[in-house]
Amino acid sequence: MNTKKEKIMLFKVYRWNPDKKEKPHISTYSVDLNSCGPMVLDALIKIKNEQDSTLTFRRSCREGVCGSCAMNIDGTNTLACIKSIDTNKKEMKIYPLPHMHIIKDLVPDLSNFYAQYKSIEPWMKTTEKKLDKEFYQSRNDREKLDGLYECVLCACCSTSCPSYWWNSDKYLGPAVLLQAYRWIVDSRDQGTRERLQYLEDPFKLYRCHTILNCTKTCPKHLNPAQAIAKIKQNITLLT
């Protein structure tokens, strides 16, 4: 017989259903942490399975590698699957990523974000028409990609950026710019000049004011602000 005392945590979750006339509101759920996994995503899944099947959110890998479960937890953009439940608190507040159109509950519309990602042409460019060999890199060139390729496109950084809040129709944002630099610095890519010329724009790149929210919030501990600064440096070297 389990006589362990309940350890109740309140989860206050943003709710909005476009199919109903209700305004957005907060629903509060009680969860016994003794029968719940350690991560916020565990609590959300438990709530959906046991209390409210209408609660809607994205999730997939549960390992911090897909970026699906990005949301704002206690004021910080992060991934719910790798965000530990703070057992020192009595409640946690969960909202969708800020300044985004919401599809339902904790699900933001990422259509514009993905369109911006597509615009930087995130694939290797080569001037050779026929390839019959691999593109080799030195160890040093390969190491230049560290801190870049790990980005999971969760949009936590971009949606934490005030410049992106106000100019998301023109400013590419820290996530997409970090991805752009990932290809600019890749020694195997042959489209560097073309990429830099595309980014040399007062809005696409230069809306970054080095606020550093992006670097602070990144759940993968990457540094988008540094990548953006290096893009600017590379542009100054164009002749």
Swiss-Prot record:
GO molecular function terms attached to this record: 2 iron, 2 sulfur cluster binding; 3 iron, 4 sulfur cluster binding; 4 iron, 4 sulfur cluster binding; electron transfer activity; metal ion binding; succinate dehydrogenase (quinone) activity
Cofactor(s) demanded: [2Fe-2S] cluster; [3Fe-4S] cluster; [4Fe-4S] cluster
Subcellular location: Mitochondrion inner membrane
UniProt pathway annotation: Carbohydrate metabolism; tricarboxylic acid cycle; fumarate from succinate (eukaryal route): step 1/1
Keyword Electron transport: yes
Sequence positions that bind [3Fe-4S] cluster: C161, C208, C214
Residues that hold [2Fe-2S] cluster according to the record: C61, C66, C69, C81
Record keywords: 2Fe-2S, 3Fe-4S, 4Fe-4S, Electron transport, Iron, Iron-sulfur, Membrane, Metal-binding, Mitochondrion, Mitochondrion inner membrane, Oxidoreductase, Transport, Tricarboxylic acid cycle
Domain 4Fe-4S ferredoxin-type: 141-171
Amino acids binding [4Fe-4S] cluster: C151, C154, C157, C218
Chief location bin: mitochondrion
Family matches, as PANTHER family: SUCCINATE DEHYDROGENASE [UBIQUINONE] IRON-SULFUR SUBUNIT, MITOCHONDRIAL, SUCCINATE DEHYDROGENASE IRON-SULFUR PROTEIN
Record note on quaternary structure: Component of complex II composed of four subunits: a flavoprotein (FP), an iron-sulfur protein (IP), and a cytochrome b composed of a large and a small subunit.
Family: Belongs to the succinate dehydrogenase/fumarate reductase iron-sulfur protein family.
Name of the protein this chain belongs to: Succinate dehydrogenase [ubiquinone] iron-sulfur subunit
Originating organism: Reclinomonas americana
